[in-house]
Curated annotation (Swiss-Prot):
Belongs to the MIP/aquaporin (TC 1.A.8) family. The chain crosses the membrane at residues 11-31, 41-61, 88-108, 137-157, 162-182, 219-239. A motif (NPA 1) lies at residues 70-72. It is a multi-pass membrane protein. The keyword Cell membrane applies. Pfam families: MIP. Transporter that facilitates the transmembrane diffusion of water, dihydroxyacetone, glycerol and H(2)O(2). Is not permeable to urea and D/L-lactic acid. It comes from the Bacteria. One of its GO terms (cellular component) is plasma membrane. This is Glycerol uptake facilitator protein 3. The gene is glpF3.
């Protein structure tokens, strides 16, 4: 057992985000890649898969850390006065690292299927988000709104009276709701680690038939969630 509380928390954030990305990017891979049994299962399957992925990531890590699994959540909790500012950057680094390794394991798990899939854009979409219509300002606004809902919802849950152990399920339902209602514009990163970590994995791994990692867009799923998370926390702070 680690004696350093921060080190244990960082391990929890790393492992929880790893599980989140393994299961979340895993469902996108299953729906997208040629010859996958789940191919063409559709958007609802993806949104459900991401909701379950968040729930499992939180359950897997909450005994070690607060299970933020998301730099925008860590920032929002700090803005709300519920988390030390000094921990925001270390948490974010652990979360991004977990995202990189999660992307790596998804690549290994589906290894034969990359060669069977020729669409480079679809392959990138397994690892990273991208807009339905590329208009950076509006893509940014979409990420702000989605993450605002996420962080405000998470903070509101802290005032709710949920039975012990149910919070991860409620969080997963919130993720599903955001995905179904707000995710169609950008693929709802709502989490810089969810996008940047696997995007790095896409960039460095020898994935068959891959193309560019679209770094020109990558600032949107980083900046949008951070702004949205901070705004959600600010609104929470001014409410009684």
């Amino acid at each position: 057992m680690m004696k350093d509380p921060l080190a244990l928390q960082l391990l929890g954030e790393f492992l929880g985000t790893f599980i989140l990305i393994l299961l979340g990017d895993g469902v996108v891979a299953g729906v997208t890649l040629n010859k996958s049994k789940a191919q063409n299962a559709g958007w609802v399957a993806i949104t459900l898969g991401w909701g379950f992925a968040v729930t499992m990531g939180v359950y897997a890590s909450s005994f070690m850390s607060p299970a933020h699994l998301n730099p925008a959540v860590s920032l929002g909790m700090a803005v709300a006065g519920k988390f030390p500012w000094a921990y925001v950057i270390p948490y974010s680094a652990a979360q991004i690292a977990g995202g990189v390794i999660g992307g790596l394991v998804v690549w290994l798990h589906y290894y034969p299927h990359w060669q069977a899939t020729k669409d480079a854009g679809a392959i990138l979409g397994i690892f990273a988000t991208g807009p339905g219509i590329r208009r950076y300002f509006w893509n940014f606004i979409s990420e702000v709104i989605g993450t605002f809902v996420l962080v405000f919802g998470l903070l509101a849950f802290t005032k709710g009276q949920f039975t012990a152990g149910l919070n991860p399920i409620v969080v997963g339902i919130l993720i599903i709701a955001i995905g179904l209602s707000l995710g169609g514009t950008t693929g709802y990163a709502i989490n810089p680690a969810r996008d940047l970590g696997p995007r790095i994995a896409h960039a460095v791994l020898p994935i068959a038939n891959k193309g560019t990692s679209d770094w020109a867009y990558s600032w949107v799923p980083i900046a949008g969630p951070l702004v949205g998370g901070a705004l959600g926390a600010l609104l929470f702070n001014v409410l009684p």
